[in-house]
């Protein structure tokens, strides 16, 4: 579930204080409700001067703080990325079945009459998503701030904002920038299928929207070309999300988008998500959030990302989940009073899974065509003893957004038993005795099989 966005139907501090008192039995049993039009300062003094009442007040503020954000609140346009909650364990296993194998009746009858008793394993694909975000946010409030909350109109709202609301606002913002980072990294890695909009600069707004709509229509048919796993997947219109940058959206009137792409304005509001920019990121905060997992964007990558007008994804493409701390809620709020500093420390803990699906459909719209310019393998030459192994890596140089994956193969030395797996790990058997002691490994671009790189291995 996403963070709640509801706000309380209160108009002033008296109504807000009445709500807080009614929410806590300790307060409601011992303190009278404020009278509209009268100062709440006398009630504030009662609360401040009694430790039991003060603690009850702070605890209630912790519980309701999320629902009364009103000043610096921001609605995350990507609330759809949260899929649910994880109650137990640290992993979520995503399973999907591809189509069943098909057989020719006459051929099978002739070649394998007993085939009907054989078991056929379903074409099952799976991917594991793990809890990878364990953060907490902290702020402090003083007795002086609590006392000021009852001094004049508006101060009670301000106190709760300072104590609680910005904790949630910080988490909400961090969710957005991490999701945006994951999307852009997938695009740059080439695992989001590119769709070129030719002559983009000369097209009219309606023609540009028409180009977007053409791929949206294709999404509704089973197609293996829009996910890196090659699953024959279809996505209905209702489950498609179109992410557009603010400049792209500003070029179109509501009428153009609502009539040329979406069914109506209501459909547009449900399936259109804005992004401030594909190329601008809060790098300093991302570094603190992701630590070693953060890979800074290069200038060339930023230049390519800046060209993107829109991205189309399945609603289930993002795999974000809250981990239920103590199996109680999406987040955990805690506070304690420090008698030495006379301050309340407020904490918000959030554990999450931030991930994306390799099976759901996605495409990135781009005005330029992507190409593979070169494939290189490192190390280019090495010496390995019989029975040993060596790890090779491939670097695929590209322009635009294309799949950077490669297919590994043994192009010389396979007769001696040399093998290479899909990750580039080469193994030489202990009995390796080819006519020549040299082994050649080739990495072939998946996107453009005319581009290859090779490595030579000498078996000592």
Give, region by region, the residue ranges found by the protein language model.
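Long, contiguous amphipathic alpha-helices that act as assembly "spine/axial" helices in icosahedral shell
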Residues: 125-196, 346-348
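Assembly/oligomerization interface modules of large self-assembling protein complexes
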Residues: 54-139
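Solvent-exposed, low-complexity, repeat-rich "mucin-like" stalks and linkers
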Residues: 374-404
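Extended oligomerization regions of viral-like shell subunits
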Residues: 35, 211-326
